[in-house]
Amino acid sequence: MQQLVRAGARAWLRPRGCRGLSALTEEAVQSAEKPEPLANAGPQAPVLRRCELPVPLHRRPVQAWVESLRGYEQERVGLTELHPDVFSTAPRLDILHQVAIWQKNFKRISYAKTKTRAEVRGGGRKPWQQKGSGRARHGSIRSPIWRGGGVAHGPRGPTSYYYMLPMKVRVQGLKVALTVKLAQDDLHIVDSLELPTTDPQYLMELARYRRWGDSVLFVDLEHEDMPQNVVAATSGLKTFNLIPAIGLNVHSMLKHQTLVLTLPTVAFLEEKLLWHDSRYTPLYPFRLPYRDFP
């Protein structure tokens, strides 16, 4: 009780111009709620696509520019939001290496084959007698230590190098590849793959003007929906390739210097890749897997 009386007396004796700590705190909160407008704030670019899938509370969507292929100067036509769990993951280069090596080897079959001493023609007769000649004993001229003989412990093809990585590792490899491409400014998003002409020279000059490098991979949602102009323009170029979104892989992304995605492709990749983060283990045979697959 005495402490309350003393505090009230101090507040009553405080000069009129002094403000208490509570008043300063209230003013600070009010100033934080009303930010000052920027003096040089220009017109904001339109956001052409919002991130529709839920984003974790501790993360924010990544914004990227949307470009157009219809002209040299139409480099930025708006913004798009990218999901951080797909385009801003941890750069696990070890997983990227595992997926790249697996993709090269899981279809590999080695047909190398050598003949053993039983398969080489000849050598059925003993070259000389066992004793008395002074030379080393031999039973066949097709022994592995003879010239023209069989091979010991040689390859016996065809040999399959097939093995399967877990699905989680393969999905993470795609996420890491997309993240690295975006971080290195080698990932570009366009509104569509429409070109004003079918001339391959226009596509090469456009890539040179925007500094895309010598090899570019264009990804659209479906192969049937790709514009005819870009199909005709890339048909005569070896380093400019088209691929549907369902066929996008780590090897193709690492092989090309620049990756170009359309807006529907971005939505498709986010939906497919994020589904694996919350998928359940099937309790029924694998012939009917994952009925909730998007």
Curated annotation (Swiss-Prot):
Record region (Disordered): 120-139
The UniProt entry, under InterPro entries, shows: Ribosomal_uL4 (IPR002136), Ribosomal_uL4-like (IPR013005), Ribosomal_uL4_dom_sf (IPR023574)
Which coarse location class describes where this protein primarily resides? mitochondrion
Matches recorded under Gene3D superfamilies: 3.40.1370.10
Q: Name one GO biological process term.
A: translation
Instruction: State if Ribonucleoprotein is listed as a keyword.
Output: yes
Q: Name one Pfam family in it.
A: Ribosomal_L4
Record's GO cellular component terms: mitochondrial inner membrane; mitochondrial large ribosomal subunit
Modification type Omega-N-methylarginine: residues: R147
Localized where? Mitochondrion
Q: Which molecular function terms from Gene Ontology are attached?
A: structural constituent of ribosome
Q: Which terms are listed as keywords in the entry?
A: Methylation, Mitochondrion, Ribonucleoprotein, Ribosomal protein
Its subunit composition reads: Component of the mitochondrial ribosome large subunit (39S) which comprises a 16S rRNA and about 50 distinct proteins. Interacts with MIEF1 upstream open reading frame protein.
| Xref: NCBIfam families | rplD_bact (TIGR03953)
As for family, the record states: Belongs to the universal ribosomal protein uL4 family.
Return the protein name.
Answer: Large ribosomal subunit protein uL4m
